[in-house]
């Protein structure tokens, strides 16, 4: 039994939610999102909350039950508050800057890395060593942050590279003489 799936998803104040067949739509101050629920899962609106139940007791239905509930919860939180992911850059000469709508990264390569920011995502650079990715779609915010981190992930010896804020890098000891 999914313990997460049992809980109905409350529709927050300031957000309008609707269920049309297998599609859940949310509209709030930050924008509009929708999620198409898998056919193995039943979804219905009950007294200001979205209820999610498995269609039957098959393994597929039960495995998609909790995930569907969490995805619906994420679209409600996204249109109300939005999501944010912070990245930190460490290393000599490593820095970031916005160039119009593109993110320009100096990461020790012979060339500048230019990242084209997708629609629906906002990237800010408060400091040259800090990047803030914001948006209403949690999956897209995480994907953009992961793509930026992938250009130069943190290395284990000196910790140089792009890492998530608060990420603990497992350090290795260098060679001994």
From Swiss-Prot:
Keywords on record: Ribonucleoprotein, Ribosomal protein, RNA-binding, rRNA-binding
Q: Does the keyword Zinc apply?
A: no
Q: What is a single molecular function from GO for this protein? A: rRNA binding
Q: Does the keyword Zinc-finger apply?
A: no
Biological-process GO terms, alphabetical: cytoplasmic translation
Q: Name one GO cellular component term.
A: cytosolic large ribosomal subunit
A Pfam family hit: Ribosomal_L6
Q: How does it assemble?
A: Part of the 50S ribosomal subunit.
Q: Which NCBIfam families match?
A: L6_bact
The family assignment reads:
Belongs to the universal ribosomal protein uL6 family.
Query: Which function does this protein serve?
Result: This protein binds to the 23S rRNA, and is important in its secondary structure. It is located near the subunit interface in the base of the L7/L12 stalk, and near the tRNA binding site of the peptidyltransferase center.
Q: Which PANTHER family match?
A: 60S/50S RIBOSOMAL PROTEIN L6/L9, LARGE RIBOSOMAL SUBUNIT PROTEIN UL6M
Name listed for the protein in its UniProt record: Large ribosomal subunit protein uL6
Which species is the source of this protein?
Brucella abortus (strain 2308)
Gene name for this UniProt entry: rplF
């Amino acid at each position: 039994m999914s313990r997460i799936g049992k809980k109905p998803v409350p529709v927050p104040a300031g957000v309008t939610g609707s269920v049309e067949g297998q599609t859940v739509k949310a509209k709030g101050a930050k924008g509009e999102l929708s999620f198409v629920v898998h056919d193995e899962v039943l979804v219905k609106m009950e007294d200001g909350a979205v209820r999610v139940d498995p269609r039957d007791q098959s393994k597929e239905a039960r495995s998609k039950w909790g995930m569907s509930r969490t995805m619906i919860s994420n679209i409600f939180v996204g249109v109300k508050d939005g999501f944010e992911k912070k990245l930190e850059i460490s290393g000599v000469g490593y820095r970031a800057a916005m160039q119009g709508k593109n993110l320009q990264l100096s990461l020790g390569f012979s060339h500048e890395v230019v990242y084209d920011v997708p629609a629906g995502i906002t990237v800010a650079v408060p400091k040259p060593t800090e990047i803030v990715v914001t948006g209403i779609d949690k999956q897209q915010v995480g994907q953009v942050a992961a793509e930026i981190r992938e250009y130069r992930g943190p290395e284990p010896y000196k910790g140089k590279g792009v890492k998530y804020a608060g990420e603990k890098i497992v350090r290795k000891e260098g060679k001994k003489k």
